[in-house]
């Protein structure tokens, strides 16, 4: 029976907030977001600060791995060349930021890169946090930027909090020189990171036969604009939308469908939040890409759409719509997982 790598999370990478380090070089904030496939509300983040040389090293390592995979249908993303003059110009900094972000996002649909030791080592030193705990309730003011340490920990001065801690980088350099047979003791932060970048565990493949492309009726369930004229939605979907209009206030009805009636106005007659329109646009394009066979683009579109839904749903004033958005996000996550296993693994 075949075995496949186990990955319980969908990932979303961003590279942002370039700043000048006190030593003179530019560093970038790298955020890795892990969204649980079982519970879309279970989101974890790892944040590290990296410089151009770190990205260039990762690019070389991953390019070597990708070359040995003999994947001819996709081109490994290029990375900006190093330069001595002009590297502090805004255009150069933006080019490097964009190149680094494209590199990280390229790894998402390739398990050999997504779970590579080099990628895990790249995020070594980052702390695993749960952003949903900070923004889960918008009626409560967010916590201060500088959390109060426990009594048994020394207080960090405000002007020191933005400086990157040198210890993880130094320790990482020492680990590369150490003999693998005698690794340093793992810390709780390292164990949490290892669980997210778990490239060693395997699970039995499902005994059911692999599903082929979805039928038109099934695709209609994922089509944000399936109510448009000429779209030809299935009778089942028409019935669902009719029930939605007739009983939008009932808790047992699905309160939100991208592009549907419930999105137009909320309970108080105000326009629906902007995040729904943004997510609808992304998911619609993902559907079109999937129909056209552009599976990497479709996967990215579903992931980006779900990312916007999960970021916007805590601030939605409608409790019924919040529940509907969560259900739809789970459906799109499931579809993204199917695309990954059926077409990109």
Curated annotation (Swiss-Prot):
Region (Disordered): 133-163, 226-274
Residue ranges constituting the MIT domain according to the UniProt record: 272-345
Alphabetical list of SUPFAM superfamilies matching this protein: MIT domain, PX domain
SMART domains recorded: MIT, PX
PX domain segment(s): 1-130
Record's keyword terms, sorted: Methylation, Phosphoprotein, Protein transport, Transport
Keyword Transmembrane: no
Modified residues (Phosphoserine): 208, 234
Pro residues composition-biased segments: 141-151
Annotated PROSITE patterns: PX
Recorded coiled-coil stretches: none
InterPro entries from the UniProt entry: Intracell_Sig-Traffick_Protein (IPR051866), MIT_dom (IPR007330), MIT_dom_sf (IPR036181), PX_dom (IPR001683), PX_dom_sf (IPR036871)
One GO BP: protein transport
Sites bearing Omega-N-methylarginine, chain numbering: 105
Molecular function in Gene Ontology: phosphatidylinositol binding
Family indicated by similarity: Belongs to the sorting nexin family.
Purpose of the protein: May be involved in several stages of intracellular trafficking. Overexpression of SNX15 disrupts the normal trafficking of proteins from the plasma membrane to recycling endosomes or the TGN.
Official protein name in the record: Sorting nexin-15
């Amino acid at each position: 029976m075949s075995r496949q790598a186990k990955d319980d999370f969908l990932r979303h990478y961003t590279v942002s907030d370039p700043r000048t380090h006190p030593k003179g070089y530019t560093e970038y904030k790298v955020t890795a977001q892990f969204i649980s496939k079982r519970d879309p509300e279970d989101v974890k983040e790892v944040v590290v600060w990296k410089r151009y040389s770190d990205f260039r090293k990762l690019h070389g390592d991953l390019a070597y791995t990708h070359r040995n995979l003999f994947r001819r249908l996709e081109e490994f993303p290029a990375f900006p060349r190093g330069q001595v003059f002009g590297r502090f110009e805004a255009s150069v900094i933006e080019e490097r930021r964009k190149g680094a972000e494209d590199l990280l996002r390229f790894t998402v649909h390739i398990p050999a890169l997504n779970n590579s030791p080099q990628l895990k080592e790249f995020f070594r030193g980052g702390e695993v946090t749960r952003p949903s705990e900070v923004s889960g309730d918008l009626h409560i003011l967010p916590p201060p930027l500088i959390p109060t340490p426990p009594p048994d920990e020394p207080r960090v001065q405000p002007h020191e909090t933005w400086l990157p801690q040198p210890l993880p980088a130094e320790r990482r350099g020492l680990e590369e020189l150490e003999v693998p047979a005698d690794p340093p003791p793992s810390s709780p932060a390292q164990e949490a990171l290892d669980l997210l970048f778990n490239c060693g565990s395997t699970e039995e493949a499902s005994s059911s036969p692999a599903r082929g492309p979805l039928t038109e009726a099934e695709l209609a369930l994922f089509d944000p604009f399936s109510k448009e004229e000429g779209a030809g939605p299935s009778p089942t979907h028409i019935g669902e939308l009719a029930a939605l209009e007739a009983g939008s206030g009932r808790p047992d009805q699905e309160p939100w469908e991208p592009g549907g009636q419930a999105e137009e106005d909320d309970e108080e007659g105000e326009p629906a939040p902007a995040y729904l329109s943004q997510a609808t646009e992304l998911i619609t394009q993902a559907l079109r890409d999937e129909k056209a066979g552009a599976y990497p683009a479709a996967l990215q579109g579903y992931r980006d759409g779900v990312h916007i839904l999960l970021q916007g749903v805590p601030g939605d004033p409608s409790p019924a719509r919040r529940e509907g958005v969560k259900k739809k996000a789970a459906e799109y996550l499931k579809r993204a997982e199917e695309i990954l296993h059926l077409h990109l693994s």
